[in-house]
Amino acid sequence: IEKILEENPDATPWTGREGPYGMTSWWPTALHFNNTEKHMDNPEVRWAINRYIDRDTLIDFAFDGHGEKSVWPMPPFAGLQASFDNLADLEEKYQPGLYDPADGDARLEAAGYTKNSDGIWADADGDTIKCPIVSLPHFSDSGPIIVEMLKQNGIDASFSVPPDVGTLMAGGDYIC
């Protein structure tokens, strides 16, 4: 965005010509799982993946340090405050935004997974945990960073922006 602003004095993002650029509070970025897919139907796998995502690093790299962490699939708008208040006990109990790779590893081990010779988590049959993220183009800044975090923790992850992503997601033809 800075390059565009340098070259075009008429260009203006939502927040003006000074960072942060864009609408940082519009809606939280989320990773969605198809819970009917093998491995993703196991809550411990989903929890492990959650623990492998370092949200501070994601914000630093994908959003140039501008953004807010959220553990809920909705922004912290004033009209939703009562909902956030009602969820506070659950958030404290489960800590859904906690970055803790050791906890992720422990959850997978407890669920019967081990790392194979390639360092990828696999079940007793040798089937690896795969998280091929399909996404809309406007998540191209964060998707590859999440993929790298997952790979570093033994999840076989990838990122793509297929032209029919809406159809894939609506039809349940995706994993992550």
Residues covered by each model-derived region:
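Class I S-adenosyl-L-methionine
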Residues: 5-9, 109, 147, 151
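Extracytoplasmic/cell-surface-exposed regions of Actinobacterial cell-envelope-associated
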Residues: 2, 90-99, 144-148, 159-161, ...
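Short, well-structured beta-strand/strand-turn elements
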Residues: 114-116, 152-167
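Extracellular/periplasmic solute-recognition and catalytic clefts
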Residues: 1-37, 48, 56, 60-62, ...
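A general structural signal for well-ordered secondary-structure junctions
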Residues: 10-12, 68, 114, 156, ...
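Append "and occasionally in soluble cytosolic enzymes with long acidic Gly/Pro-rich linkers
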Residues: 41-148
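Structured core elements
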Residues: 32, 132, 156-160
